[in-house]
Every structure is written in structure tokens, then in C-alpha cells.
């Protein structure tokens, strides 16, 4: 079915979100060979490819990495994540999470965040992104304009950020700058 989409609509990219690393590589090689234009391959890999693929050793969750005080170590971890993604044929990681975990009632961010302060989230996420870039992987910080101080699961509904423009600019948007 995917091969038909590639041929019929000349799609430019794919996102993978489940399976195993061997099958993933086989599919990607097949799809790339079939496409006349190289496909941009993406994955939602906030804590490495183990977030989506089975039988892969996971990296620590962002909440754990939020406690690491060594930016060079975080950058090295980000690079290892990126190298793992690159080996599988991934070019683009929908990560890191730039949400500031400031709402205990938030049902979805929690351990996906690097912390509860804008400074910590900015610092930790930047090092992880730089590591990915060192490995040649594109990144996309999420969830713009901030999902850390909401009480809804964005996989089930559309959360809203009901703060003043000043607050959103000072807090929620800070890691995106």
C-alpha cells in the first residue's frame, strides 16, 4: 500500500512509528529504492528509537536526563540517539520535547519533559538537539506553543494554553527561542 502511495502521489516522506529495527530498515530500503525522489524519513523518537520500535535498548526518558548537569554528556547522548536513528535510515526526529512540566494534572507530558523550569528545559533540550545535529539528524522541538501547563492529552483532544501573551512569551515559548 505504501509503495502505491509513493508511486501514485509521489510523496516526499514517511514517518515510522512501530515495528522492529530489522523490518524498519528493510521497509525503508525498499521504499527508497522504489521512490524516484529520495524520501525524507521521520520518527517520533523523544528518547530514541525505542520509543517506537521494539527490541531496541532505550535511552533514559527526558525527565531523567533533566537531572544531568553535564551539557557535554547530554550532547553525547543526543549524538548516540541520532546515530541510532541514522543507522535505521531516519533523517528527522520529532524531538525533543520543549514543554515545561509545570502542571501536575497534565496527563501526557510528565516524564517526557526535561523539567519544571524554562532554563533547565532550554539547556537540556538544546544539548540533545546539538547531539542529534552532530549525527546529521534534523530535529523539531515540540509542542509549540507549549503543552506543559495544560490538563488535556493532545492525543485525544486539542488542549489550550489560556495565559496572557506576556506569560506565554516569557514561559511557554522560552525553550523555543
Residue ranges of model-derived segments:
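Enzymes and membrane/adaptor proteins characterized by extended Gly/Ser/Thr/Asp/Glu-rich
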Residues: 2-124, 143, 148-164
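Phosphate/pyrophosphate-binding betaalpha-module
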Residues: 132-141, 167, 171-177
Amino acid at each position: 500500500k505504501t509503495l502505491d502511495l509513493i508511486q501514485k502521489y509521489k510523496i516526499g516522506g514517511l514517518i515510522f512509528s512501530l515495528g522492529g529495527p530489522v523490518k524498519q530498515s528493510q521497509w525503508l530500503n525498499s521504499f527508497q529504492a522504489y521512490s524516484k525522489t529520495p524520501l525524507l524519513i521521520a520518527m517520533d523518537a523523544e528518547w530514541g528509537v525505542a520509543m517506537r520500535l521494539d527490541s531496541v535498548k532505550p535511552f533514559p526518558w527526558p525527565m531523567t536526563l533533566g537531572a544531568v548537569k553535564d551539557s557535554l554528556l547530554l550532547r553525547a547522548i543526543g549524538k548516540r540517539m541520532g546515530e541510532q536513528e541514522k543507522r535505521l535510515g531516519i533523517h528527522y526526529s520529532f524531538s525533543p520535547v520543549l514543554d515545561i512540566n509545570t502542571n501536575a494534572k497534565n496527563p501526557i507530558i510528565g516524564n517526557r519533559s526535561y523539567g519544571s523550569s524554562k532554563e533547565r528545559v532550554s539547556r537540556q533540550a538544546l544539548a540533545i538537539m546539538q547531539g542529534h545535529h552532530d549525527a546529521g539528524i534534523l530535529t523539531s522541538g515540540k509542542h509549540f506553543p507549549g503543552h506543559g501547563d495544560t490538563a488535556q492529552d493532545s492525543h485525544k483532544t486539542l488542549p489550550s494554553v489560556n495565559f496572557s501573551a506576556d506569560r506565554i512569551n516569557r514561559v511557554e515559548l522560552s525553550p523555543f527561542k
